[in-house]
């Protein structure tokens, strides 16, 4: 079989769709700083509030403010609105080909009308824009292997042209690449391997499109930009490790799912220099720890070197005694 690479249309890399933060979101981020300060000062118990809860709320607010404030109005300049515009434009442009698209979102799964869901809202707005309801599907609705196979076949054949799902449910094993023309990251996952799994659905053999589009939606002044920046940093370190770069002595835990107080405060400032400083401070702290470990090991090695002459002398005496004993062994006869 001939190997054919699937390429990005937008200059060989994902396209960033930047969305401005609303005044309500900016104010909410400031409350996250106050919560982080209370946690750092010990004013609240871990079961009452913690950095993981703050990080989750920050990510939800960056995705859609209605996830943290259900009574808030729809943001016409937000990520959902931007995604609707991009998905609809590509849907129109690829009608003759019956091109399909994937939308990834981990933070807000379908609720079945019980409470606000980004999935339900996005689907309703896509329908309102003119996309037939039968051409939109949630991967969550396919609960059995047979249902998944039926759904995936519909995507490959172009009968379902917009499929929404999470990394866990639409990652490994989702073979729908035949007509995929675009992929949309509505939120950022935590691990580089999750980004790889998402984009691996479209950048793979069997896709009839020679060029595809990948979108990353980012709300400015929110947790989004820092999340993607962190993902790229982690991915770079992992790539260096996999290549056997001997200059890499340690790698932070890629599973960590909470930002620090300093990172939250830096994000709230909205100043890129402050955000950069938070990253530099974290790097300095990590290097300081590594230096302390190296210094302690060096002291231990120097102490060991100081004891080696005495150990050698003692062992040489033992060897001499063993040799003296060996020379005097008398053969035993039965």
Cite the ranges covered by each PLM segment:
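Conserved SF2 helicase motif VI
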Residues: 191-209, 231
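Conserved strand-helix element at the start of the C-terminal RecA-like helicase core
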Residues: 43-54, 96-120
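Conserved helicase ATPase core of P-loop NTP-dependent helicases/translocases
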Residues: 123, 132-167
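C-terminal accessory regions of helicase/translocase ATPases
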Residues: 88, 125, 261-334
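Inter-lobe coupling linker of SF2 helicases/translocases
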Residues: 1-73, 88-92, 214-289
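Conserved helicase motor "Helicase C" RecA-like lobe of SF1/SF2 P-loop NTPases
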Residues: 107-140
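A short beta-strand element within the Helicase C-terminal
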Residues: 175-188, 212-216
């Amino acid at each position: 079989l001939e190997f054919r690479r699937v390429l990005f249309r937008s200059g060989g890399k994902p396209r960033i769709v930047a969305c401005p933060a609303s005044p309500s979101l900016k104010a909410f981020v400031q409350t996250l700083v106050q919560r982080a300060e209370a946690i750092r000062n010990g004013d609240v118990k871990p079961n009452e509030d913690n950095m993981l809860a703050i990080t989750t709320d920050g990510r939800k607010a960056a995705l859609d403010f209605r996830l943290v404030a259900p009574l808030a109005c729809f943001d016409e300049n937000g990520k959902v609105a931007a995604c609707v515009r991009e998905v609809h434009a590509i849907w129109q442009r690829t009608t003759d080909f019956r091109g399909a698209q994937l939308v990834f979102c981990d933070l807000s799964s379908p609720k079945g009308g019980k409470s606000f869901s980004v999935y339900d809202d996005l689907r309703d707005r896509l329908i309102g824009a003119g996309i037939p309801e039968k051409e939109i599907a949630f991967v969550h609705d396919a609960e059995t292997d047979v249902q998944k196979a039926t759904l995936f076949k519909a995507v490959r054949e172009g009968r379902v042209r917009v499929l929404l799902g999470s990394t866990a449910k639409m990652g490994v094993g989702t073979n729908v690449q035949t007509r995929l023309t675009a992929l949309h990251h509505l939120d950022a996952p935590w691990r580089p391997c999750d980004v790889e799994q998402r984009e691996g659905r479209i950048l793979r053999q069997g896709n009839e499109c020679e060029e595809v589009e990948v979108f990353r939606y980012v709300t400015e002044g929110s947790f989004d930009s820092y999340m993607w920046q962190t993902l790229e940093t982690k991915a770079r370190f992992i790539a260096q490790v996999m290549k056997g770069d001997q200059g890499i002595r340690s790698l932070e835990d890629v599973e960590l799912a909470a930002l620090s107080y300093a990172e939250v405060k830096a994000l709230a400032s909205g100043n890129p220099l402050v955000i950069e400083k938070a990253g530099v401070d974290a790097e300095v702290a990590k290097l300081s720890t590594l230096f302390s470990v190296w210094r302690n090991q060096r002291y231990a090695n120097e102490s060991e070197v100081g004891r080696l002459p005495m150990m050698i002398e003692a062992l040489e005496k033992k060897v001499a005694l063993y040799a003296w004993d060996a020379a005097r062994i008398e053969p035993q006869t039965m």
